């Protein structure tokens, strides 16, 4: 588990990485994205006076309750967070082959929302995920080799 200070610094780094991306909401695959997007939302509200709603996408559809793979908080007016034409920033902790993030991207696009960008904390540089890097406004905090070493850390 990360300390509170590390979580704040990570949220700040992701918000800085997102600069220049026009987005309305932030979300990603459960479980990796949940703490990241929540911390980003809190830090942004407190330090930048910029608020945004969050969502996450489960890998499987719930069998009870909403019977949905998408979890999103309702706005005060009762509307869903993620709706058609919403600009969604997708966040994930690690990118290897892109399997889990593909589920989130598909859920966003099926609603009719736009993927504004994709942020990754650690990109493991697997060529199976090249389609994500090439198709979206893609940014990673760190690129990591198969052996676990940072690749070009000063370039990020």
Model feature map: region roles:
Residues 1-92, 96-156:
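PRPP-associated nucleotide enzymes
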């Amino acid at each position: 588990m990360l300390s509170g200070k590390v979580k704040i610094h990570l949220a700040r780094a992701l918000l800085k990485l997102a600069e220049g991306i026009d987005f309305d909401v932030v979300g990603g695959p459960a479980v990796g994205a949940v703490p990241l997007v929540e911390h980003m939302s809190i830090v942004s509200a407190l330090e930048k006076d910029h608020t945004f709603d969050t969502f996450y996408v489960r890998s499987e559809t719930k069998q009870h309750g909403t019977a949905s793979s998408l979890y999103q908080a309702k706005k005060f007016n009762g509307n869903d967070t993620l709706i058609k034409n919403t600009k969604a920033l997708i966040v994930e902790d690690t990118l290897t082959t892109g399997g889990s993030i593909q589920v989130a991207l598909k859920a966003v696009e099926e609603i009719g929302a736009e993927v504004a960008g994709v942020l990754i904390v650690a990109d493991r540089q697997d060529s199976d995920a090249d389609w994500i890097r090439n198709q979206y406004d893609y940014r990673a905090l760190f690129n990591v080799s198969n052996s676990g070493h940072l690749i070009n850390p000063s370039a990020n």
